[in-house]
């Protein structure tokens, strides 16, 4: 018997072949998310960061008088003086950084990898990182610690964020 789902799959394969479509799973979707700099709960933020460190400060209504809430003044202060910032990293070599890998300058831990991948679109080894603001400038050289953070290090530098289409000029559909 031929089920509806297999018939749909046949149409997808037949029509998609002409358009260059290929089946892709969650790993491909996650790579695209990282390239685009899209944050994911549980990776880039988990409720332990303020909205500005988490990269969702745009959702906090600090400027309107109608939107008053407990903690508004504290959040204004946090926005003005952030402790951490979400940045992009480009790593040297082909070993991808993983969620939770530590980021160092010398012996000091200055950040943590939130997501990383070998980007097939950009042909680069990239990551998202929450880092102390003093090390968040583009071009800053850091090292990603593997194993215990000290035994093996991967050279990296802070780069523009998001990695892919940073000015959002691609057509949206």
Would you name each region that the model predicts?
Residues 1-8, 12:
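Single conserved hydrophobic/aromatic residue that forms the stacking wall/gate
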Residues 18-31, 151-157:
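Flexible, glycine/charged-enriched surface loops at secondary-structure junctions
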Residues 49, 53-173:
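Glycine-rich, small/acidic residue-mixed loop/short-helix segments
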Residues 13-20, 38, 42, 162:
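Structural signal for hydrophobic packing residues in well-ordered secondary-structure cores
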Residues 25-44:
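Short, conserved secondary-structure transition motifs
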Residues 9-10, 45-46, 169-170:
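Short acidic, glycine/serine/threonine-rich loops at helix termini
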Residues 6, 41, 96-97:
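Short, acidic Gly/Pro/Ser/Thr-rich loop/turn segments
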């Amino acid at each position: 018997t031929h089920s509806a789902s297999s018939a749909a799959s046949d149409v997808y394969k037949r029509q998609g072949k002409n358009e260059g479509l290929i089946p892709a799973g969650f790993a491909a979707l996650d790579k695209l998310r990282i390239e685009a700099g899209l944050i994911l709960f549980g990776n880039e933020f988990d409720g332990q960061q303020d909205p500005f460190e988490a990269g969702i400060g745009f959702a906090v209504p600090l400027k309107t008088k109608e939107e008053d809430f407990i903690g508004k003044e504290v959040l204004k202060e946090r926005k003005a003086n952030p402790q951490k910032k979400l940045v992009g990293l480009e790593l040297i070599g082909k070993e991808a950084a993983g969620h939770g890998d530590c980021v160092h300058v010398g012996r000091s831990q200055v950040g943590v990898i939130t997501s990383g991948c070998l980007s097939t679109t950009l042909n680069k080894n990239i990551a998202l990182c929450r880092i102390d603001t003093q090390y968040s400038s583009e071009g800053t050289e850091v090292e990603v610690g593997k194993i215990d953070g000290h035994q093996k290090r991967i050279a990296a530098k802070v780069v523009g964020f998001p990695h892919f289409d940073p000015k959002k000029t691609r057509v949206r559909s």
